Amino acid sequence: MKEEKDILNRDVEIPEVVFRKADAALNQIRANTGSTKATRKVTRIQGRIHHVQAAAVACAVLIGAGGITATAAVIHHLWSRGMQANIQATEEQQKNLTDQGMVTQFDQAYTSANSDLTGMEVTSEGITVKPMEMIADGHFVHLSFQVEGYDLPDGEEPFFETVKVYTGDEETAEDSFVNMNGSFYNGIICDENGNPAYEDGTPLTADENGTTIERYKAEDGTLEYVMTLYKPDPEESLLGQMLHVQMENLGTVNKTMFMNGIEGTWSFDIPVSGKDAAQTYELNAPLENVNVTVLSAALSPISVRVDYEVTGEIQAQEDDNGLPEVGGVVLKDGSRMLYLLDGGQIGYQDDTHAYEISSFDRVIDVDQVQSLLF
């Protein structure tokens, strides 16, 4: 078992627009996590991301040669622009995920008379919403919707006043709860260094007031709403379940205030298809100075789960339970993919066992991963 040690010390400036969206996402998560155990936590994205000591643990046996590099901002799109921003991938990676059975492209289903997914678009008050794509593994579901017919004023941020997502027959049942983080895609992605940029690779620009200019509209004037979903119980998967999605009232938002709303309801029942493509590695690797042993890691192209054993006291703070978090991966060619994690949860299962599940903002080639960075 190879073990690396590495010191990362890097500050990344995050513009106000990204920080504001992180706050909105956190508030949405908090609103949706009332029934989860108190030991679980959602980590807030800070205005500055500071990486300090990181221990890298080997998580795969070397198989063959070769490697991959971090994806660039400008690529050919097979997926919708919002989904591509949510999970950046090369054209080859997009095809590979489709071949693995992890991708459902609803626009193809609409043209198939034999598909159970036909006729899913809903029109209310002249605004049509329809699912575009779904990417799912054993832990996370990414779902994108196209919104057509809404005239978004320049400089405004589109917003659904209410978005509900649940499984099962009863919305209020405990086992129906789904963690959800969703927003309209604003034309901004994070590059391979964790810095925000427009989807065409150009740097962000600001208006005369210094506010970052966001690009919600596609060339055809449509908008795209993208959500990431997972069950609060890390042992439960959404695969094979029926997602009930309801969006109500479309308008704009300014400093958390909903404005100019058009009353409407768009409801969908979406069966979750995908594939649990994770590869699990038994590690039993102690991390230095934190009294934590990494028992195992399960890597899929779009997410990671890590199971820990807590072997002694760890330093916890008010909003941080002190557990280590995955900081990236090292590939077999020696290159690193940092700033990968894009939301999830970390917490205790009992006094000595803990876990982390997190989605990635980029697709990775699991076979080319040599080690994890903490």
Describe these PLM feature segments.
Residues 1-47:
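Disordered, charged N-terminal biogenesis/targeting segments of membrane/secreted proteins
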Residues 10, 22, 26, 68-374:
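Alpha-helical, hydrophobic structural elements that either
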Residues 15, 50-53, 365:
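Alpha-helix initiation/capping motif
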Residues 31, 44, 49, 56, ...:
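Intrinsic structural disorder/low-complexity segments
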Residues 42-74:
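Internal signal-anchor transmembrane helix that establishes type II topology
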